[in-house]
Every structure is written in C-alpha cells, then in structure tokens.
C-alpha cells in the first residue's frame, strides 16, 4: 500500500485474477496444477495391472492393486499371473489405497503376491481417495462444502499464530487455495520494511496452514537491505515454462534522506517450479521505463498475462503517481511486452479485478496512505486494457470500506453459480504486524455491484451459493 502522492501524507497492496479449472489463480485463468496423472477416473492403470483380467474393473481403487484390470501389476507375473481368474494378487493387496493414482502402490511387478486368489473385485482398492484427473489433480476424498467466514474472530493459522499475508493474492491449484502476502511479523513500529513473503494453504478458505516463507532476505543478496520494501505479491502459473511466477512492488524506504518516501518505484519478479516452494529472484525494474507501485496480476484463459500497477514518472525520484497502467507480459511472464494507460490522473491504488461474462470490473482505493477510504470500481466491456468507463462506482461500503483496503477478489466457481469474495486488509499503521483482514461477498443487483458488512457469513464451496449473508 502506502503509494505516495503529492496530495497525500507520506504514511503508507494487487490482484491476481485467475479462474480456471486447474490452477484457478483468481486472476483469470491459467495455471495448470503441478503433479500429474493422465486421465484419472479411478485407477489410471494402477497396480491392478494392464493385462490381468481377474480384477474385472477394480472399481473401488484409485490406483489400488485391485485397480484397472486386476491386481497382478503391470507385468503381473509373466503375462497371466493377473490372469483370467484374478490370480494376480492376494485380495488386491497391491496397494490398498494407492496414493496419487498414477501407477498405484501395487507396484509394477505385481507385488500383490504370486498366486493370490483375490482379484475379482479389486478388493485392495477399497475406497481409494485419489486417482488423477486429466488435469493432473487428485480426485475423490473428503470435501468440505459449507464454510463460515468470521470477520470478528482472530485470523490465525493451524498453529495458532496470526496469519501474516498482507497485501496478498490467491491462486487455486487443484483443490487447494494458496494465499501469498507480506509477512509483517517484525514490522511492529509502523515501518513496512521487507522481511519475508509468506505462503499459506487451505482446502476450505478457513483452515490455513503456513507452508513456507517463499521469499526472504536470504533468497538473494540484493534482498538483504534494511531499507527494502516489497509489497502486494501476486502469483500466476505459466503453463509453457511450468513455473509459478510472482510479481510485486519493489521500493526503498527513503529517498534523498527523506524517510517514508518511495524512491525506486519498481516491480520485482520471482519464480518457482512449485507453488509453495522457495522462489528464485529474477530481476527488479521499472516496467517500460515507468515508475510502478501498488500492483496486481491478471491472467486470461488463453494464458495471456498482465501486470497492473499505479504508474508514475520513471527514474529514482519520488513523484506523483496518479495513473493506472496495464502492462502486457511476455510469454514467459518475466518482462513487459507493452504498456497501456487505463485510468489517467485518477490517483488510485490497491487494485483487484474480476470478470463476469464479457465485462471486467476493477476495484481500487484512493491514495490515503495507511488510512482507509471508500472502495470504488470501474467497468470495461473490452479487455483488461480497456476501454474502461470514466466514472467510479462506490461499492456502498461506507466511507472507509469498514476500515479496509482491497487486495484481491477471490472467485468461488461452483456447480450452480460463481461467488466473488472481496478480500481486504485492515491496516494497523502503528503496528503493522497486528494488521488483519476483511472478507465479504460481492453481490450484483443486475446493474451495480455492492458490498455489505457481515460479521459472519457462509458459502457452499461446491455450489458457490451463499448460504447466509
């Protein structure tokens, strides 16, 4: 946050919008999840073997040795040990609940046993929880449906610690949401200097496990600078390079000796082959020679990606950042290919985008440092680069958006409808480590989007339907 304008006190986030079946990064599409399996549906050629016919269909298994075609295993003990009578493996012992489903723990050589009389119904497979779907995601297993978001209780992780993911973004990989954000545990005195970027994981948007500090001051020597600021990290997946790519705002705490100013006004890029692994520093720079501060990412279903940020003059001087710029990224997502100015002289920051049908919506806040203000949105019937209408529509969220600032819009794509969740930061300017969060469902009346406060509200993650609001 804390974008600085000449018009505002120098006291002081971005959106990845994905939503596809696979990585669904809330920024619009794209990612293909890690891991892999072929066509799933149950066993994917599990240890039930490829030739043994005794297994009938091995329905229960998701790769268990009663799997696809009998429990004899891939070679099943010559070619017939999984044979017609299912002699390939003592009651499907080739892997009771084959994990992952790609080859089944029954093994490739019919480890289910030599002349076991089992087979027949693939009893070893029991109720295996995960084969692999065609997109590489596990299938089956327990699914949480109705969940309640509590805006009044503590936002803690599974260890009881306060969630440190400020200015964050979200990406969904298979059945898991990942929440990236600024770790401000050590920012107890109101300064926003960089310490780490956190990654949390959840299957229900309520129970969050801290997976990793994916970027730290030890990631690269260039990050070990007490004046460094990194804000609003967002992550999308590049299906071509098979890398998760993170963009964020890069800056320095002081300019020409003036504490509290942004002087670099740049973007920074990191990559990782796994969503929650250690990310590698790539570069920091001014996109197309333009200054860049608060930012987010957007990804189209065809994989085209955009970096959106508060733009201003190039160079290393603190200046007025009144414009909003959309930077189309290169095919590897590591550099900028072209730049379009979409909201000129509107002095906005803290962007979050979502798309419904053929319309794009972009919510943002005014630039008032750490102090909250009323969030408002614009509409584009063209592309993320516009044309946008020129009149901001308030979300009706009182004059401070209940003391929050936008950071992301999370789409919950269900079997009946898609619900869009406004995710905001509630900043504590005196002790940033105590900053917290506000999540509310966006509602549409056919003409206008609205945000209404609820201390608690519930949603069915399978159908996408709000069950209470």
Where are these regions (language model features)?
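Ser/Thr-rich, Pro/Gly/Ala-heavy low-complexity intrinsically disordered linkers and tails
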Residues: 13-139
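Arginine residue identity/basic-tract feature
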Residues: 2, 28, 55, 61-62, ...
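Terminal low-complexity, poorly structured segments
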Residues: 6-9, 22, 116, 145, ...
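Carbohydrate-active catalytic/glycan-binding domains of CAZyme proteins
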Residues: 136-469
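Sec-dependent bacterial lipoprotein signal peptides
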Residues: 1-17
């Amino acid at each position: 946050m804390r974008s600085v304008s000449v018009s505002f006190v120098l006291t002081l986030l971005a959106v990845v919008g994905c939503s596809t079946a696979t990585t669904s990064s809330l920024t619009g599409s794209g990612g293909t999840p890690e891991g892999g399996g072929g066509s799933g549906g149950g066993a994917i050629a599990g240890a039930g073997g490829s030739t043994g016919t005794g297994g009938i269909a091995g329905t229960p298994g998701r790769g268990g040795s009663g799997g696809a075609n009998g429990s004899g295993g891939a070679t099943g003990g010559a070619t017939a040990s999984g044979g017609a009578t299912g002699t390939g493996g003592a009651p499907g012992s080739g892997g009771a609940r084959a994990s992952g489903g790609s080859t089944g723990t029954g093994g490739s050589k019919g480890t289910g046993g030599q002349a076991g009389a089992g087979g027949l119904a693939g009893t070893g497979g029991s109720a295996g929880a995960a084969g692999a779907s065609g997109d590489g995601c596990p299938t089956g297993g327990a699914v949480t449906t109705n969940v309640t978001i509590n805006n009044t209780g503590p936002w803690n992780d599974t260890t009881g610690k306060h969630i440190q993911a400020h200015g964050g973004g979200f990406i969904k990989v298979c059945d898991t949401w990942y929440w990236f954000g600024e770790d401000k545990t050590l920012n107890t005195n109101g300064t926003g200097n960089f310490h780490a970027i956190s990654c949390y994981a959840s299957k229900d948007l309520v129970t969050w496990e801290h997976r990793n500090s994916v970027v730290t001051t030890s990631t690269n020597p260039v990050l070990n600078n007490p004046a460094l600021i990194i804000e609003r990290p967002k992550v999308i997946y590049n299906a071509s390079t098979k890398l998760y790519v993170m963009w964020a705002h890069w800056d320095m705490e002081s300019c020409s000796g003036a504490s509290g100013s942004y002087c670099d006004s740049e973007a920074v890029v990191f990559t990782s082959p796994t969503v929650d692994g250690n990310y590698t520093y790539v570069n920091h720079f001014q996109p197309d020679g333009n200054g860049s501060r608060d930012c987010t990412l957007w990804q189209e279903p065809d994989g085209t990606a955009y970096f959106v940020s508060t733009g201003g003059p190039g160079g290393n001087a603190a200046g007025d950042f009144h414009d909003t710029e959309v930077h189309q990224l290169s095919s590897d997502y590591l550099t900028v290919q072209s730049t379009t100015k979409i909201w000129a002289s509107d002095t906005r920051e803290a962007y979050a985008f979502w798309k419904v049908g053929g319309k794009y919506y972009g919510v943002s806040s005014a630039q008032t440092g750490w102090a909250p203000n009323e969030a408002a949105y614009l509409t584009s019937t063209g592309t993320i680069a516009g044309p946008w209408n020129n009149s901001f529509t308030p979300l009706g969220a009182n004059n401070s958006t209940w003391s929050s600032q936008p950071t992301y819009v999370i789409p919950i794509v269900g079997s009946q409808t898609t619900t869009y969740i406004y995710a905001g930061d509630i900043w504590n300017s005196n002790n940033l480590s105590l900053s917290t969060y506000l999540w509310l469902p966006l509602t549409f009346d056919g003409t206008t989007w609205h945000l209404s406060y609820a201390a608690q509200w519930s949603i069915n993650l399978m159908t996408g339907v709000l069950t209470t609001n």
